[in-house]
Amino acid sequence: MSLRPIMLTRPPVEIMLDDGFWDELIEGGFRDVCVSWMVFLKEVQSGERLPSHEEARPRVLSYFEDKGDQFKYVPIINPDDSLYDGLTLNPPTRSDEFDSIFGELRDAFQRAKEKGINLYLFDDKSYFEISGYPAGSEGDRGFSCWNNPQVAEYLVARTRDYVNQLPMFSGIVLDGPDYKWEIAPGERDDLFAECCACDHCQNAARAMGLDLMKLIDALAAFKLELQQLDDEKVRGFLLSTRGFLGAADWWLSHPELLDLLRFRYKTIEDHLVRNYEGIKNHLPEFEVMASSRTPSYSALSGHSLPRRSAYTDYQLPKLYLWAGNQPGFRYTVSNYVNTLSEWNPSLSRESVVALTERILGIEFPMDYPIEKFDGPAPSSFYEQVAGDEMRKMIHLTGDVDRLIPFIALEHFGGPQIQPQEVRDLLRTLEDSGINRYIFFHYGVITEDVWKVLTEFSE
C-alpha cells in the first residue's frame, strides 16, 4: 500500500510549534502538509467557539484544555503594503503582541522543512484565510466576487507576501471558487438561489456576447420545468437521452442553459488563469494546485477538468462522499431525489431515482439504494460509485500523476464516514491508479481513522 497523502491542517497553528506534531505526521507517512486558515487564536469574550464539534485529535483537544471557549482569528503575518499598491482590496494586519510567536512558528516551519516535509499555503475561495477577507474601499471586510479581476490580484499579492516571510513554503492549494450545484431549497449550494448580478458578472457576460439577466431567467425557467414533471415526461427524457447524441435535442431546446454553463466555465477559468499566471510570473517554481467538485457535478460548478491542466500544476477534485450534511456526495444525491419527489408528488420513486441517475451520471449499487444512504456504505458503493468518479477524474484530467483528490470524513456536523469506509475508499483509490490524495483535515482524525490512513501511506 503506497499512497502519498497531503495532510491539510486547521487552527490552532500553535500546535505546530512542537516538533512532536511534525514527527507524528512523518511517522504516519505524511510528508506533505497544507496549512489552511493560517491564523493565531486569541481568547476573547465573544468570538468563534472552539474547539468545534468535529475536533478529535488529542493534540488539538489538549491545546484548548486550559483555555476559554471563544477566540478571535489573528492573521499570522503583517502585510507588506507595497505589494498591494493599486488595489482597492486591502489585507488584514496583525498586532505586535504576536511578533514573538510568529518568529517561533517560522522557525518551526523551517525545522519541518529540514525534516523533509513539503509545505503548502491554502487559499479558501480567494480570501486566503478566514480572518483575511480583503477590505474594500469603505473598510468593510467580506467576500468579493471572483469576476472582479482585483480578487485574483489580491490573491497573488497575498501569496507573494506569505512566501517572502515564509520562504520554506513551496506551493499553494486554491480551494474553489465554485458556482452552485444543489437543487434543494435553502441549501448553501442551491444553484437556483445563486444569482449574482454585480457589475463584474454582467461585464463578463457581455464580453461573451451574453445577457446575464437572460441566463438567470433561464435558470428560473429550468427550475419551474423540474417542478412540472410526470412519469411520461421522465420516461421520454430517459429514452431520448440514452445515447451520446440523444441529449443534443434537449440542449438545443435550452440554449440559455448551455450559455449559462459556458459563462460558468469561462469565468471560473479566467479567474484561475489570473491566479496561476500571476503567481507563476513572480514565483515560477511555486506549485499551484486547484480544487473542484467531483465530476458528477463539476459542470454545474463551473470547472472544466480537461482544460484545467493548462492553468494548474495539480488538480484536486473533491471526493466528499458523506451523507449527513453539505457538501457530501450522498447528501447531494439524496437532496436531488427528495427535492424532485417533493416538487412532483405524482412521480413514481422509480422515475425520480432514474432521473437523478441520468442527471448526475451515476448508478446506485443494488445493495445500497438511496433509502440506505444515511447508514454506512458497503464496499460496493466505493467500488462502483466512488470508483466511477475516480475513473472520470482520470479520464477528464488526462494525467493521473497530476491528480490529488480531496477526501474527508464529514463537514458541518453530519455523521462521519466510518473507518471501514475510509479503508474501502483508499483501497478503491489505490486500485484506480491514483496514488495521491489530500485529507481534510488533521483535527478530525480519530485513532481508528489514523490507523487506516497510515496503512495506506508510503
Where does each model-flagged region fall?
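Catalytic domains of carbohydrate-active enzymes, especially glycoside hydrolases
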Residues: 17-43, 51, 55-82, 164-171, ...
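Substrate-binding cleft/loops of secretory-pathway carbohydrate-active enzymes
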Residues: 131-139, 181-183, 285-329, 414-432
